[in-house]
């Protein structure tokens, strides 16, 4: 919501030639980092409880607790990746944004295997592969930021609640779409968990 909305607000402000248009990029990054601290805190102290609320039994909690903890501790990377991707896409470089998404996903798939099996890191390795993938995405997006074609400038400024609200208003539709997908997936998981247990949920996740 913050990333997509701020990127749209930035594009509108740039067209209007507003002097503070570039502030939206830094502002979005700062607010994403600040809000992601809630996920980091929850991941460190309440990862097992979160898994239980989402329907995991004690066996799954024992196996996946470290995965959840590592994954949530990297929340700042995931949220900042959404911001950089949205700004690159709105700055006339959708190809780079798509490449960032594609290669970060490929990195995740390949390093899931490498870290889990050859390096024998198990679920922690899978979590690290997933957690590091947004860094790859941001690295690819930075190619655009450092190019001459980029109009996005990283202007350090104080976090602005007004700009946060202005950006978030335009990102509500994206937020609703993401939340709808999450709720549907969660509902399916609960139903399948009752019908087929953990194996059924795993099979549904693969499909």
Residue ranges and their predicted role:
Residues 64-68, 127, 198-206:
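Small-residue hotspots at the loop-to-helix junctions and early N-terminal turns
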Residues 38-69:
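Short membrane-interface helical motifs at transmembrane helix boundaries
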Residues 56-64, 68, 75-102:
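Cytoplasmic helix-loop-helix junction between adjacent transmembrane helices
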Residues 32, 71, 97, 101, ...:
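Residue-level signature of transmembrane alpha-helical cores of multipass secondary-active transporters
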């Amino acid at each position: 919501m913050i990333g997509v909305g701020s990127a749209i607000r930035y594009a509108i402000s740039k067209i209007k030639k507003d002097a503070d248009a570039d502030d939206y990029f830094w502002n979005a990054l700062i607010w994403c980092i600040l809000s992601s601290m809630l996920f980091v805190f929850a991941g460190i102290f309440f990862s097992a409880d979160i898994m239980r609320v989402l329907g995991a039994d004690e066996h799954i909690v024992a196996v996946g607790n470290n995965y959840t903890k590592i994954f949530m501790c990297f929340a700042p990377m995931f949220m900042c990746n959404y911001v950089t991707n949205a700004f690159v896409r709105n700055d006339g470089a959708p190809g780079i944004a798509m490449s960032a998404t594609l290669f970060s996903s490929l990195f995740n798939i390949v390093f899931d295997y490498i870290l889990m099996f050859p390096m024998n890191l198990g679920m922690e390795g899978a979590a690290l592969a997933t957690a590091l993938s947004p860094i790859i995405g941001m690295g690819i997006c930075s190619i655009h930021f450092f190019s001459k074609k980029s109009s996005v400038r990283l202007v350090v400024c104080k976090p602005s609640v007004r700009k946060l609200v202005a950006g978030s208003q335009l990102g509500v539709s994206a937020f609703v779409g993401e939340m709808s997908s999450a709720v549907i997936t969660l509902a399916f998981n609960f139903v399948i968990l009752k019908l087929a247990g953990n194996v059924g949920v795993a099979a549904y996740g693969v499909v």
